[in-house]
Amino acid sequence: MLFCNDSNKELREQKVSLSHEFATDNHRVEKLSLKFENIYFDYSKNLVNDNILKTLLESASKSNLKNKIQQMFAGEKINSTENRSVLHTALRDLSNSPLVIDGQDIRKEVNEEKQRVKALVEKVTSGDWKGFSGKRITDIVNIGIGGSDLGPKMVVRALQPYHCTGLKVHFVSNVDADSLLQALHVIDPETTLFIVASKSFSTEETLLNSISAREWLLDHYEDEKAVANHFVAISSKLDKVEEFGINLEHCYKMWDWVGGRYSLWSSIGMSIAFAVGYDNFEKLLAGAYSIDKHFKETEFDKNIPVIMGLLASYYSCAYQSQSQALLPYDERLCYFVDYLQQADMESNGKSVNLAGEGVDYQTGVVLWGGVGTNGQHAFHQLLHQGNVFIPVDFIAVATSHHNYDNHQQALLANCFAQSQALMFGQSYDMVYNELLNSGLSEVQAKQLAPHKVIPGNRPSTTILLDELSPYTLGALIALYEHKIFVQGVLWDINSYDQWGVELGKKLGKNILKAMSDDSSAEYQNLDESTKWLIAKVKSK
């Protein structure tokens, strides 16, 4: 990353005091905040000054970020290790202008697929789609993992006030049978439609759960023909889908140019549409599209995803931050951190650059967090008084869907108080005087004061939404998607492959064979620790 060059060492070592910056610049918030439609982005509590921001923006230009953005939107194959375009943005592009990739106008293909999904959703929600026994569908079970689960699950929960179809949507992901059983215990085989979401139709967890769900269905019906009434698929392997018993008319496309962690905008978002209706699903896409245009067309100093990516990369480089906390102050966003963990860590958890050379600077960080105010009674202690450097993103919503205004005001007050506490902290003198005023002796106050000091000067960003609607949620997700892209460009890494997950899958298959046959080559090749663990399992 250019900002990590030795030539910028002096600038990187420049210490910024937030208390000083706010005390000496009455216009700091005005200068270091941005508004886009109904999103307010306040980054004034970050450890930057005019000089640092200038250098960061220059770094973005020197990294050829503008051209890289254009390349992505144009469909150039920026996923170099897999020779693929990165075009999740095309799934929500409302311009309808042609986009030709490998000789085909994918815009036309995308729109056709959207209409197929819309038709299915309307057929099921209207009651025209019937189960094998003639009953209408009441429950949808999405079987998928990773991007086929985390995104849709997050959105369905976040948009719960917009559920309007009467359908109950469930999610099954883990290969642990308990994940599947939780759904099977509350659904009726005669009124359930399963979605099998797997590009290869061979993902171990998804396939095993789907086979077990199929067996459960057939235990009830005892007729193979029932599968076609109760299963649809999202896959590119038509032969495997047909072999499973799913009508190919009910198999929906997945394209190579859409990565799993960016796939909720595709047919993978079908479960979202089943919950909130297709019109609201389109509003989700429209919100993301608005940010796509903002990202592509706005100058860097006013570009929210660019600023987000620059700040995160700056902290990784200059402060060696190894994690970032994401704190949504809205219960509806309770799965947002889980979703972004995959989007961020699977994208930027890389240690070689685009040329395949090892990098000597830090790249991806651990993204973690939880909903407020729960975190205040769990891990915020570390944020305030721990000796690790952790930048924080607060996400808040100005208005809620309910009428409990006192709850909403308390929630927002806590959010803003946490960002203020991180910024200013409380000094020894402040604590000492408070203790004296509370009645403690000087000796007692001196003993206790060091334990109550909060250093402050810890950076945070606040993203404030007017409301949490399908449109604003789509925009929020897209902000973070593009932030991840910006970081990848600055670090000169490929944010769109994920080779690191393959080894564990391969070894898992070998160990599964070894567990059933200790004379197999797979067992003989195991290390002693793994053999010991297998023996312990077999002894039970």
Swiss-Prot record:
PROSITE patterns on file: P_GLUCOSE_ISOMERASE_1, P_GLUCOSE_ISOMERASE_2, P_GLUCOSE_ISOMERASE_3
Q: Name one Pfam family in it.
A: PGI
What Enzyme Commission number(s) appear in the record? 5.3.1.9
Quote the cellular component terms of the Gene Ontology held in the record: cytosol
Q: Which residues form the active site?
A: E346, H377, K505
Which of UniProt's keywords are assigned here?
A: Cytoplasm, Gluconeogenesis, Glycolysis, Isomerase
InterPro entries in alphabetical order: G6P_Isomerase, G6P_Isomerase_C, Phosphoglucose_isomerase_CS, SIS_dom_sf, SIS_PGI_1, SIS_PGI_2
Protein's pathway? Carbohydrate biosynthesis; gluconeogenesis; Carbohydrate degradation; glycolysis; D-glyceraldehyde 3-phosphate and glycerone phosphate from D-glucose: step 2/4
Where's it found, cell-wise? Cytoplasm
Q: Which molecular function GO terms apply here?
A: carbohydrate derivative binding; glucose-6-phosphate isomerase activity; monosaccharide binding
Q: Which GO terms describe its biological process?
A: gluconeogenesis; glucose 6-phosphate metabolic process; glycolytic process
PANTHER family found in the cross-reference section: GLUCOSE-6-PHOSPHATE ISOMERASE
Q: Which family does it belong to?
A: Belongs to the GPI family.
**HAMAP family assigned to the protein according to its UniProt record, in alphabetical order:** G6P_isomerase (MF_00473)
Please identify the protein, giving its name as recorded: Glucose-6-phosphate isomerase
Provenance organism: Francisella philomiragia subsp. philomiragia (strain ATCC 25017 / CCUG 19701 / FSC 153 / O#319-036)
